[in-house]
């Protein structure tokens, strides 16, 4: 057997393969997005049956094959039970996982995306914030992490950093009061909205020790 490697990450999706196996897509801190086969994981007496479903965060012992990995052992640190037991929340979680899957690449550092997904699912499970608001924050932060966020800090036309209050789709950013007259597709935003967008883009997404412990 090839050398066993331990990775930390979150299972984005789990699909049945054959009679007893599962095909997993895991976003890992060490190797980015990887495909892992969990052999026999659907057998009733398998040690992997409870730790190879979507949204499980933990450590996974895997060994690499030519095109994919095979799971040897897994240890779950967070099951997100409050999410998977709520139909509405799990629908949002699936959407968030799809976005992470879209941006994830093998051998690219995915630490910040994992942290973002982790604290987002935590927020979903707590239920203190509306799912729709969580979705908006996640979307903006995810595109910011991956370098695709609109410029919310300077005017697209003149570069000034104050009086920004018009968003333009065609310019993919904000325009100041003076330049807004040249914008045909502008949407007027309040100062608090602009500040919130800027804050989300700069948000530090590492989980707190309380979150990591799962308490």
Would you name each region that the model predicts?
Residues 96, 139, 172:
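A residue-level signal for conserved active-site and pocket-lining positions in enzyme catalytic cores
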Residues 99-152:
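A broadly conserved sequence feature marking short terminus-proximal activation segments
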Residues 155-158, 176:
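Short cysteine-rich clusters marking metal-coordination/redox-active sites
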Residues 162-164, 184:
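Short functional micro-motifs and their immediate structural scaffolds
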Residues 168-174:
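Small-residue-rich helix-loop
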Residues 182-193:
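Short metal-binding segments enriched for Cys and/or His
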Residues 204-215:
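Single conserved hydrophobic/aromatic residue that forms the stacking wall/gate
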